[in-house]
């Protein structure tokens, strides 16, 4: 031992590395043990793979072998018969004694074949008695002896441990430090490190022993649970008596119910309610059987489904009173979800539809009067011409809408550029048509067409009731509408009732509620005729956006 010159509080020790031929191994036990408590002699051994290989080879040849382990080294006693050839053709067997070192005896077998004079090349009968040996086509994989666990046990078998090698020893080194009397350290390199853990041995039991063992376990568990119940019971009397009394009371109640049922004289009679319950499923079965008779599998052409097309091809309105009531109920349900502005818009659309219906009715009445007061006449050729031309004439009489084509296939701009001669030709056509319309047959056909058109309009109006957000497109910039606006905007305080002003309001505010926009144009909207115009202008300029459950109008 020598003190360090750098720091007086530190001590330095000299380490002397021992270089020798001895190999030291370290055994580490997982728990504290006392080797003196082991019953002697103590035995430590491991499985020998080499001996197993030799046993397998010897078994193939029918040769027994034994192996023993002494002084941490392997030694084998191989009992192998040696075959020596005798001069008279007979074989004799013998054994070689074991020596202190591992010895391996080699055996040589010779067979003599004798041939008779009359049978050259005859087989030897002794060769048939020898066992057939199959040649090995592969070799066993080499086994690392370090990976084979050690087994440590005493003579009585009370202490048994199994030791496995520690980790990957190819990348680690172990040293044993031994302090010497002169203050130096002797470092001894260690070969292997083994961790020893106690080996658990499971006791095998028969079926009867296992049943007895489980009964004892159940009894112990019952005792344990009863003690816990006594501790948890506040009265301290224990829960066993209460449980037994509860079980007895339940059993008594069940017995009383059985007695009442058995003693009841009407137990086999059925009541009216039970009869009704039994008859109900029988009636259902009868109805199902009747429905599945001759026409039970026939398709139902009258039933309607959600994905069916509209009844536009049917004569008349195509809707019954029940259908109209159902539509009204649906409208009432939709009204609950609409805001105040939406309800006002819906009312305006309904008024416009009613006006259109009233105008159609007046036109029908006029046609009837003309039919009653008109004179007979007209040829079949005129009727045929009337059937061919009405579509074109109707299209030519439609109001001029921007971007739409006329019956001739020309746009409004092209119509304006036509010569006066074209206008004169159109006027002559109209005069001819009036002459044809004066005949009673043509009037009857027109009345029928007007009725069919009114029925289609009614259907469309009922569809519009379901979809209030899609009003009829009315162009506000027509000359008649502009004249109405000029007449209505007499009050100087009211804002101009134009599409441009609505666009300016939307651009300034960016998003407006429908009620706020209606309040701005409150004066012009007092006139009911302005409401559909206002709807059309808003539809052309703005679109609806929903934010956080609130609907706003924003410019397009």
From Swiss-Prot:
Domain of life: Eukaryota
Biased composition (Acidic residues): 291-338, 378-394
Xref: SUPFAM superfamilies: Rap30/74 interaction domains (SSF50916)
Location in the cell: Nucleus
Region (Disordered): 82-128, 226-499
One GO term describing the cellular component: transcription factor TFIIF complex
Family (UniProt): Belongs to the TFIIF alpha subunit family.
Protein name, entry field: General transcription factor IIF subunit 1
Source species: Dictyostelium discoideum
Gene name of the record: gtf2f1
